[in-house]
Structures are given as C-alpha cells and as structure tokens.
Amino acid sequence: MSKSKIPQVLTIAGSDSGGGAGIQADLKTFQERDVFGMSVITAITAQNTTGVQGVHPVPIEMVKQQWTSVLSDFNVAAIKTGMLVNGEYMKAVAEVYKEVASIPLVIDPVMIAKGGHPLMEKSAVSVMREILAPLAMVITPNIPEAEALADMSISSKEDMVKAAERLQEKGCRNIVIKGGHAVDESHADDLLMLENGEQIWLRSERIDTKETHGTGCTFAACIAAELGKGHSVEESVRTAKKFIQAAIRSHLGIGHGHGPTNHWAYRKEHE
C-alpha cells in the first residue's frame, strides 16, 4: 500500500474521446482539486461535442480487475462512479465496493449524454435504485435522473424534496438533485438533502450557454475529491457548486456542439 499522504481518489466511468466528460473530466477535476486520480474504465465511447457515435463496454471481468488492481496498491480516499452501462456492471461495482464500504462513494447516475444518446439501459434503473445507490454517501441526479430513480415527475421545488425523500426511503443517504433542467429561467436551484433530513438549497445564476458537456461528471468528481480530503458532505457539495459554476462561466468555445467546461477556471479565479 502507498504511504503517501496525498489524497487518492478513484473514478469508475466511461472514457470520452472528446475529453469533456467521463473519465477525462473526472481526472481533470481531481488534478484541479489537488488529489491524485486513478481510473477504472467501464466503456470506451466515440464521442465529441455533437454527440455519441459509438459505445464499446469493457468486459465486466476487466472492470473488476482494474478496480482490484487499484485497491491493492493505493490508499483510496474516495470513489466516484459515472457511466455504468447496465445492471450487471452496477452489480459488479456493488460487489467489489462492499469489501471497502468505509470509503466514501459518490454516484453520478449517468443515464443520457448531453446530445441525447442513452448511456444506461432502462432496465438498469431499478438496479441503480435498489442495489447501488443505497451504498453511496452522496448521489447526484439531475432532474430527469431523479424522476427515473424516484419514479415520479418533477416540476417544482416541492417535487424535488419529495423525490429526495423517496430516494432516502430506498436507503440513499445524502442526495443532491441538480436543478439545471428545471423551468426557472433565471436561476439553478440545487437541493442537498442530508441524511438527517436537513434541506439545503444552493442557488446560482443560470448561465445562458450550451457549453455544458461534462458538467454532471465534473460536479460529482469535485464532491469526491473534497470528501477524499476529509471535508464534510455539505462542505464538499458547496465547493463543487462553486467549482462547476466557474467552469461553466469560463467555457472554452471548443467544438461545434455542446462544448466542454473550463476545468481550471475556479483555480484561475482564486489565484
């Protein structure tokens, strides 16, 4: 095992050939938050800012082998999951995670790419809800993902609270429902429902841009990085909110579609 005191954080997700989301976004975020990042790749995708052209899942046994390889040599301080393809991958992740359940787990329940391409089989939603999500310290669904997981429609802040309560009834601990898909045109209100039932609303100005590829990955990765450094759930989520807002504000103008965010913007703003 490594003896370094540098926080070491693991991401389990798909590879984005365009570099804006998935493993690539996670590792950039880890670097910016001063933690050492490792990765387990669940799928190789051919994608760019205009969409996903192909998905090639990595064999489940290879996913397990990558994970056990990392765990055998590194002091993993936090784990973040992203694209997990289907229920069998989720069950495999849950199986291995139960052996290291003291490590904080952040789940980004990735279901659909920014361009609309499905990244999770519909049949896997129940596996995510019943088996994997209850293992997480934090789960970070957007509105459509929260609707699928809570099996209800969300059209108001009251609905967001109700969805979070439903997820807690299923065993989820701390839930962040991201309000970026909500109807409020001026603000994005995220709900952090702590495991003790406390509701914390995090409001930010809505930024008028389509340069939002990888925002969900980046947000969850930042939470994992902060948890890996020993911060509380609330502190970690608040930092991640500031980090992603800076990244969206200072987008890079790369590509011809939904471009990536600027992962070094938060650091530049605070230099």
Predicted regions and their residues:
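Conserved N-terminal subdomain of the carbohydrate kinase-like
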Residues: 2-11, 31-115
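Charged C-terminal helix
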Residues: 6, 57, 234-271
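N-terminal phosphate-binding or glycine-rich loops at protein starts, especially the Walker A/P-loop
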Residues: 8-32, 237
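Short pre-catalytic strand/loop immediately N-terminal to key active-site residues, enriched for Gly-Thr
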Residues: 12-18, 199-213
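Short, small-residue alpha-helix embedded
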Residues: 24, 147-148, 209-233
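Phosphate-handling active-site elements
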Residues: 33-38, 198-200, 226-240
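Conserved phosphate/ATP/ADP-binding segment of small-molecule kinases
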Residues: 122-199
